[in-house]
Structures are given as C-alpha cells and as structure tokens.
C-alpha cells in the first residue's frame, strides 16, 4: 500500500481518504443524520399493499392512531397535495413526480397504502399492523412470454435506438454455420448494503433532506416537482451512500414519505425501508427473453448477428433496458440486427440495475458466441479474436478505443490458455472464455477547486460516493494536479448547494466529475500564473513545507508564491 503522503498517486493502491471515517463509524449515512435535526426525528413505517393493482375501497386507521407512541397515520386522504405520479410526462424519469399516498390507485404489489409515524420503530411497526384496508383487485398486466412484448420503446437507457439494422442479410450457403438460441434471465434487485432511507425536516418553507441518492441535482428537481415546491427552498445532502447499483439514481418512496410526514407534523421524520420493503418499493431489473441468431462461414468469420430482446416496462415509467447494445459493437459482422420490445406491466419500478443492458445482454450474446464457436469446431478465444472490429460495426465510425482484443490476449497469457486441456467428452468441468463490453459514457459535470497559501486544496461538488472511492479518486486528481499528496486535499461531496455534477451511475462518475476537477485545477493554476512575472508563465506549482510554491521551468529555484 502506497503511503498517502506521496505524490503522483493516481492508479496506486493508497489508503482511501474516507477509510478512517468508515471503519470508526464516523461516516454518517442517510438514516444517521439525527444529530443535524432540531428534534429527534419521528420514525415512519409503511403499510404495504397486498395486491398488484386495484383501488383502495376501505381504509381504517383508528386502531393504529390509538396505539402507543403514534403521532399520525397518513393515507391518500390526508397526506396533502402532490403532483400526480410520473408527471409532467415530458420530464426525465429522475425528475418526474414520485408521488405516493396521493390517490386510491394501487400500481404494484407492496405499494404504500399508509404511513405510520411514531416515536420509535417498534411503535410504528406495530401500529402499521393495525391498519385495516380493502383493495378492489384487478388483473395485473405482466410479461409472461416474449411474444407479449409488442411495444417499441421511444428510446433505450443510455440514449440508444431501440432497433438497429446494418448491412444486408446474407444469403445462407451450405457451408454456413448457424445457431438460434433462446435465453431468459430473471428479475434482479440490487439490495445494496444500506437500505433506502431518508430524514426530512421543514423549517418554514425550507426543506432539508438527507436521502440515500446517487444523483443529487435531479433529487432536488424530483422533490420540487412532487411536493410542488420551489427548488431554491430544497436542500439535499447525501455525503455517504452504502451502495446503490442504480437503485438510488433517483428518489423513491422513503424520501417522499419522509417529506410528507415532516410537512404534515412540522417536525423531522425518518423513513428507512426494511429489507422486505426494498424488494418491492425500489427499482429492479426486469426479467428478459432474448433470442440470439448467429451465423458464420466455415472459417469462423461472423456473417450475421441478430439479437432480439423482450422485457417488461413499469407502467408510467420510461425506462427500457438496452439489452442488445453490446451485440452492436463487440464483434464485426456483415449484417447486424438488434431489436427491443417491451410490455407495460403493473410492477414496481424497473430501472437501471448494476451494468444495465450489458450484464444480461452480454450473458446471452457471449453464450451464443460460445455455442457458435463450438459448432464451428473453433477455439472460442480464436473465434473472438478473428472477429474484432476495426471500426464501429453498425455506423462505421472510428472507435475512440476498443481494447477487447488486447484484453483477451493478455488474459489468455496470464491464464495460460494455450496450455489448457480440452474437457473430456461428457464432462461439464473445463475452461472457458467470455467477453464483456461497457460503453464509455461522459456526462456534463462541474466542480469548484480552491487552494490556500499553505497549499491546502478543497474540492467541492455535489458528486456522490456510493462506496466506489469517489472521495479518494477526486483527491488523487487534485493532488496530482498540484504535485502534492492527498493529505493536502479535502473533498466535499453530496450537497445540492455545491456545483452540480453527473452524480454516480452508469460508470460515468469518476471520468466525468474527475475531468471537471482536473479542469478546475488547471483554471486555478492558470489564474495564479497570470499574477506572476512573465518568466514564471511556464512554471509548475508544488506544495512544500513552505506552503504553495512555484518552480520555474528547467530551474531548481523554488520561490514562495504570494496569494
């Protein structure tokens, strides 16, 4: 482990700058910000629907209201004004209304029917069991077979087109080798270590919210939309997040319920979902039906790739997973056809879940590639290497980078692929290879960087750290920019009053916000250089025991820089 006081630490396994806070319990997560509240927060516990879809016809909260410690029971009859769920429909999915307890309609199994507010969790949970309700259940619309998915989504997650067809479908010859495979994957849920939780507090018309959310800026917008408030009156803080994997990209019921409760009682409220609640009140990955049709010639060169995906889409929510995106770029083929079909279903939200699209799409695609290589009697590694694209297989554009070939070759060398023994007939134990492709995504981000005369650097942005090391990454970037160690860098994250970033998600966080931090560092250095004499214009900054210093190019002279 490289000591943190060394310089040029990018890429080195240094100690995480927030590590001590975490291992000593000083890093506060969403449900732990009670110290910042003017009163001890009341605890909210939700009452969950037992039907997948229908209308609430009867609701009796009288017994719950009389239970020990209970301060209020909120339902759609008294929760207060909220903009209808998923409105306005021209907004992005993370900024639309996330309304709950706003009408009698049940959209999915487990949806909150009521919220009990009490002094303790035990009191709230017991009182929740006393709430009586009836639901006029209706048949749920679900995706049970691929041919039921007939809707073409407007777009896919990541901005991909739902359907792509490139080249001309080849005429089959007698020597062509084909596979036509069906793959299914189950629905999946992130179930991060930290369940979704929120503490909310109103001070007059000012709302402060501590949620567990990956993108802070859109959380402010979603709260403003849902609660019909001015964004300037909302302050969101999310300094530490115990895992997200996409399930916390946007706000969910815990945040809205906490805000509704705080508004109703005019005191702080905490709502933390139980592990059971997480499974039907937060986003999940929908199950998939995938058909892979691949063809190659007798030499093992791909002639045709067809990837057809069918998945459910939550009603009132725009997300559709880009399952076939990988098949469009991983290997070269003369003909590529990729389609996506969905069915609007009465389910909890379906949204980005750990490596959306790629995780399940590459599973089907790479499995089919293996099947084709086996049928062609060609080594699966050789088969892949023979089909590396020189340009984008669909649009012909030049890749910024496409490192799959070198990755496979390096992996084969480390693994000793050439020395492997073939599996014996009838045996299922052997060696294999598979590829995974994740497109590089950059999203607009901003950051503020300040440095004082002692060389102490402060980085401020609303970027979040979901356990991926953002605090350390940004500290390393700033430290390297000024030729100092991360010990001289303070990073402030997760506050909506800071410059807006991309947030964490889609594997774009470090690259996008890291670039913003680097640009801000360069701007600071440029401003400082403009104050120096002409012969220092090509100088370098560094931090010594004298504080912030400047060194002339090609010179050993070090001179303190006045700030």
Where do the protein language model's features map onto the residues?
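Flexible, low-hydrophobicity surface segments
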Residues: 1-157, 181, 254, 326, ...
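Structured beta-strand/loop patches that form or line metal/cofactor-binding pockets in enzymes
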Residues: 269-290, 434-437, 444
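Extended active-site and interfacial segments that coordinate phosphate-rich ligands
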Residues: 17-21, 44, 129-142, 221, ...
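Short, surface-exposed loop/turn segments at secondary-structure boundaries that line and modulate
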Residues: 74-111, 218, 236-257, 276-291, ...
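Stable alpha-helical structural segments in soluble proteins, enriched in small hydrophobic residues
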Residues: 114-118, 124-128, 226, 256-268, ...
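Glycine-rich loop/linker segments at domain edges
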Residues: 12, 17-25, 89-92, 160-198, ...
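Helix-loop-helix junctions that connect adjacent transmembrane helices in secondary transporters/permeases
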Residues: 148-227, 387-456, 541
């Amino acid at each position: 482990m490289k000591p943190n006081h060394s310089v040029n630490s990018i890429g080195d396994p240094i100690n995480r700058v927030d590590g001590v806070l975490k291992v000593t319990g000083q890093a506060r997560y969403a449900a732990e910000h009670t110290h910042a509240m003017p009163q001890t927060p009341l605890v909210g516990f939700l009452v969950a629907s037992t039907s997948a879809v229908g209308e609430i016809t009867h609701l009796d909260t009288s017994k719950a209201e009389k239970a020990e410690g209970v301060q209020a029971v909120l339902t759609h009859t008294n929760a207060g004004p909220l903009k209808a769920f998923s409105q306005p429909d021209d907004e992005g999915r993370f900024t639309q209304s996330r309304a709950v307890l706003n009408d009698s309609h049940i959209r999915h199994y487990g949806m909150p029917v009521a919220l009990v507010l009490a002094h303790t969790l035990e009191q709230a949970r017991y009182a929740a069991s006393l709430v009586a309700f009836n639901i006029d259940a209706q048949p749920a619309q679900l995706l049970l077979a691929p041919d039921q998915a007939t809707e073409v989504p407007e777009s896919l997650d990541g901005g991909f087109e739902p359907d792509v067809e490139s080249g001309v479908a080849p005429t089959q010859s007698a020597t062509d080798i084909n596979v036509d495979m069906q793959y299914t994957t189950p629905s999946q849920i992130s179930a991060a270590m930290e369940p979704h939780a929120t503490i909310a507090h109103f001070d007059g018309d000012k709302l402060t919210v501590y949620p567990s959310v990956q993108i802070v800026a859109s959380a402010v917008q979603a709260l403003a939309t849902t609660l019909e408030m001015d964004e300037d009156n909302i302050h969101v803080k999310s300094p530490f997040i115990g895992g997200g994997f996409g399930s916390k990209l946007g706000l969910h019921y815990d945040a809205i319920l906490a805000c509704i409760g705080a508004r109703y009682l005019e005191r702080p409220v905490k709502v933390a979902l139980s592990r059971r609640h997480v499974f039907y009140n937060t986003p999940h990955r929908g199950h998939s039906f995938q058909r892979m049709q691949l063809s190659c010639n007798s030499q093992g060169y791909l002639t045709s790739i067809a990837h057809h995906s069918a998945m459910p889409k939550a009603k009132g929510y725009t997300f559709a997973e880009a399952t076939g995106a990988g098949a469009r770029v991983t290997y070269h083929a003369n003909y590529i056809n990729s389609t996506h079909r969905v069915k609007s279903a009465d389910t909890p939200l379906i949204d980005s879940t750990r490596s959306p699209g790629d995780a399940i799409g590459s599973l089907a695609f790479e499995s089919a590639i293996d099947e084709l290589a086996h049928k062609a009697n060609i080594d699966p590694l050789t088969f892949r290497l023979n089909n590396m694209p020189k340009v984008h297989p669909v649009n012909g554009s030049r890749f910024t980078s496409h490192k799959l070939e070198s990755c496979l070759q390096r992996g084969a060398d480390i693994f000793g692929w050439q020395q492997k023994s073939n599996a014996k007939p009838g045996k299922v134990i052997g060696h294999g290879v598979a590829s995974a492709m994740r497109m590089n995504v950059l999203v607009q981000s901003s950051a503020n960087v300040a440095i004082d005369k002692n060389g102490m650097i402060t980085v401020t942005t609303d970027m979040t750290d979901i356990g991926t090391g953002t605090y350390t990454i940004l500290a390393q970037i700033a430290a390297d920019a000024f030729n100092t160690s991360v010990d001289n860098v303070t990073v402030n994250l997760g506050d909506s009053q800071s410059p807006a970033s991309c947030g964490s998600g889609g594997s774009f966080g470090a690259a996008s916000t890291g670039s913003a931090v680097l640009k801000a560092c360069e701007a600071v250095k440029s401003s400082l250089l403009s104050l120096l004499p002409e012969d220092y214009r090509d100088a370098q900054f560094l931090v010594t025991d004298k504080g912030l210093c400047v060194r002339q190019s090609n010179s050993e002279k070090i001179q303190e820089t006045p700030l």
